[in-house]
Amino acid sequence: MAMSFEWPWQYRFPPFFTLQPNVDTRQKQLAAWCSLVLSFCRLHKQSSMTVMEAQESPLFNNVKLQRKLPVESIQIVLEELRKKGNLEWLDKNKSSFLIMWRRPEEWGKLIYQWVSRSGQNNSVFTLYELTSGEDTEDEEFHGLDEATLLRALQALQQEHKAEIITVSDGRGVKFF
């Protein structure tokens, strides 16, 4: 069921790999890069990587054009994603990051909709059951990494819709 990724037209345009000096053009270019990063990571269910991995990945490195976005420009794109709430730096050096193609609140909403739809309120789940269990195989959050899942559950906890608990084999969550 692997879907193919459709690169935006800009990806085939060499100047896209050089951040433009004109403020308006740069804003449009950064918006296009942000959209591309989120779409690419969503399709590949990629939630974390280092800046160096990013630079070598097809995302920022168009082998056909023999063009790659420089590290400094990648960091500008990533910082733009952070400002929008779609990225969290995992270290002080800003060399590795967590990419969130959906913000934690959005993931929490999707999970809670599934819980309600399937009549699972007042039930306890392990984190594994939520992201790897048979019952969630058709849900978008199936396969979600634990760091993003915990942020989503924390958002639900703040809304008093869930409580993160410790269960015998790790962490779990009770939904209300």
From Swiss-Prot:
GO terms for cellular component: cytosol; ESCRT II complex; mitochondrion; nucleus. Keywords: Cytoplasm, Endosome, Membrane, Nucleus, Protein transport, Transcription, Transcription regulation, Transport. Its main location: cytoplasm. It comes from the Eukaryota. GO terms for molecular function: protein homodimerization activity. It is found in: Cytoplasm; Endosome membrane; Nucleus. One of its GO terms (biological process) is multivesicular body sorting pathway. Component of the ESCRT-II complex (endosomal sorting complex required for transport II), which is required for multivesicular body (MVB) formation and sorting of endosomal cargo proteins into MVBs. The MVB pathway mediates delivery of transmembrane proteins into the lumen of the lysosome for degradation. The ESCRT-II complex is probably involved in the recruitment of the ESCRT-III complex. The ESCRT-II complex may also play a role in transcription regulation, possibly via its interaction with ELL. Belongs to the VPS25 family. Component of a complex at least composed of ELL, SNF8/EAP30, VPS25/EAP20 and VPS36/EAP45. Component of the endosomal sorting complex required for transport II (ESCRT-II), composed of SNF8, VPS36 and 2 copies of VPS25. Interacts with CFTR; the interaction requires misfolded CFTR. Interacts (via C-terminal half) with the ESCRT-III subunit CHMP6 (via N-terminal half). This is Vacuolar protein-sorting-associated protein 25. The lineage of its organism: Eukaryota, Metazoa, Chordata, Craniata, Vertebrata.
